Regions:
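Alpha-helical segments
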Residues: 1-263, 270-275
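Conserved small/polar residues in nucleotide/adenosyl-binding loops
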Residues: 288
Length: 288
């Protein structure tokens, strides 16, 4: 693993049954770098570096309490209108059954059946890597109010009407090296809530690039640019932040592993600066 891509990675031993020194109910904040979506950066929602907030149950509470807590936090603590929330659950396959239990938990919490969707492993199953702890997940989406892209518009279509805000993973399986699934010794809950995306929604912004983390850099780029290109401004701002966080954690540009990813981010950022016709020597003014 080149970078921490999810909050679960440091906790794998405890998901497998090892006792955590802080107990069975945890919360955490995790710096994450994901480069699988690097070519999507520049749109209204993708980031390479982001901060993930999570809460955990290590053999403690499971689906019903997890769903109830998530619904309460979103609607009561954050004040998100309940009618704006849609959810997805695992549709089931030959390996694991349909997750009707979680769907019923959502109905009990207050989500009507017409806003509960079922999808397969591509959308509602989580595993970090090819093997290890895994399980079905339930994702929470915010309806932005945009027009439907089609009659079949739903949270999985990617048109931008629905924005994912939280993901609860119910880790009750272990995928072995031979591709088989077996039950874990304990049932776990792993949740992940993207800080930047949630800030965007709570501040009434349309993209993460409008929140206070990015706005000063975005404004400076707009001041310096000679060519108006919103996607390039977003890429420069995002890759600058990502590169700085990697360097602060000890990363150095190179031709291999983590260093290559960092080098790639810097090169992409430099190309976009040139596209904006901004002198690359002015990058220090963006950092300050």
């Amino acid at each position: 693993v080149l970078f921490t891509t999810a909050g679960m990675q440091p906790l794998v031993p405890y998901l497998l049954g090892e006792k955590h020194p802080e107990g069975t109910r945890l919360t955490d904040f995790q710096k994450c770098v994901r480069t699988n979506d690097i070519n999507e950066v520049g749109d209204n929602r993708h980031l390479t570096y982001f901060e993930m907030l999570g809460n955990w149950s290590l053999g403690d509470y499971f689906k019903e309490e997890s769903v109830a807590m998530s619904y309460e936090f979103l609607t009561k603590e954050l004040g998100i209108p309940a009618e704006k929330i849609s959810v997805t659950c695992f549709a089931g396959d030959e390996d694991c059954p349909k997750d009707t239990v979680t769907a019923e938990c959502w109905k009990k919490a207050g989500i009507p059946e017409e806003r509960i969707y079922f999808f397969g492993k591509d959308d509602n199953w989580w595993i970090a890597g090819e093997e290890g702890p895994c399980g079905p997940d339930t994702e929470m989406f915010y309806d932005t109010g945009k027009e439907k892209c089609s009659e079949g518009c739903n949270p999985s279509c990617g048109c931008g009407k629905y924005v994912e805000i939280w993901n609860n993973v119910f880790m009750e399986y272990l995928k072995t090296s031979d591709g088989k699934y077996q039950k874990l010794k304990q049932q776990n809950v792993d949740t992940g809530l993207g800080l930047e995306r949630m800030a965007m929604l709570l501040q009434g912004k349309k993209t993460p690039f409008e929140i206070e983390i990015f706005k000063p850099v975005m404004d400076k780029l707009e001041e310096l640019e000679k060519v108006d290109d919103i996607a390039s401004r977003r890429i420069v701002a995002e890759h600058l932040r990502s590169s700085m966080m990697i360097i602060l954690d000890g990363g150095i540009p190179s031709n291999v592993d983590r260093g290559y990813i960092l080098r790639r981010l810097i090169r992409r950022m430099t190309r976009r600066l040139r596209k904006l016709q901004i002198d690359t020597n002015q990058i220090l003014s963006l950092i300050h």
